[in-house]
Amino acid sequence: MSHLFILSCSVYDFSSILLHQYFTQFFVLRYASPSMHLDWRFPSLRIHSYPKDQSTHAWKMHCMPTEIIAYQPIPVFQRLLHSNDIYFPYFQTRYTTLIMFNTVCSSSPNPVFTLTKVIARKKGKHWIGSPCHSAESS
């Protein structure tokens, strides 16, 4: 059975990530082998949001993978560059895909984020895909 590497249950400081939308966050999903394909039914993530830290204006998120066969922590990217092509020099791994999650509008203090679409794939040393502002909805 295929294994995925996904963000593990940890609290991250997302203050360095440029967010285009109020309720948009970006995470990285890395495949364990080049032959794997994204199964839209498989990546099941429930992301709990913490109150915004007014002193640092940083959002803190907690990732809780569910129905994941195997997962290990991978570093979250430090910045998001807006250009005709997406390029993240922070990641040099060969099989990495940028995934966008959008929250379900809810009055709950812990809104649920759902997988919306793949907005970029890595080809060689560069990311190819639409700038995030053109991929904010699916």
UniProtKB/Swiss-Prot annotation:
Which GO cellular component term is one of those annotated?
mitochondrion
Q: Which domain of life is it from?
A: Eukaryota
Protein's name according to its UniProt entry: Uncharacterized protein C191.06
Instruction: State the organism named in the record.
Output: Schizosaccharomyces pombe (strain 972 / ATCC 24843) (Fission yeast)
